[in-house]
Amino acid sequence: MVWLSEFAGCFILLAGGYAYMCNISLKKTQIAALNYTELTIAWSLAVGFGLAVSSIMGGPAYLNPGVVLGNVICNGMGIGEAALYLLMEFLAAGAAMLVCMIFFWDSFRASTDAPKRGIFSAYPVEKNLPLNFIQELIATFFFMFIVFMCITGVSDLKAGNQSLIIGMVGFGAVAFLSLSFNSTGYSMHA
């Protein structure tokens, strides 16, 4: 169930985020224009619900290669276990992409001249790879620090309450970082 929870949480996170990106990037959609506040809320909700779903299903809700790598380095997670988490995350990314491609098929076909690069990937505002890497490290540090500090003691709560708090912390951390340490287009801690 742990592997399924990682897949499900990551799928919810990415499908929600990708769908919003499709809405603002493609023609013939309901939103059709970038609004930074909406973008922040959409990605924050996607992360919050992804974390909550994964947690409810009994998983640790890593949902991110950066978090898995951090557990390998800091917590002694084995390479084999890490590889399975990464596999679930990459499979979830592919499934979320496929669902969005199907859901927005007509919009993709109508958007021959629209920029599609940012739907399924992120890129920095200013391309400076060494600095961008450092920016990602800083954003990842803030994300992990906030999450770990805020969920201390959560294990003492009932399972449903744990999942709700974990989801809310994820929502809040992403919203905060999106409006502050975000120079690489929501790829922070990815």
PLM feature spans:
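Membrane-interface helix-loop junctions and terminal tails of multi-pass membrane proteins
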Residues: 1-190
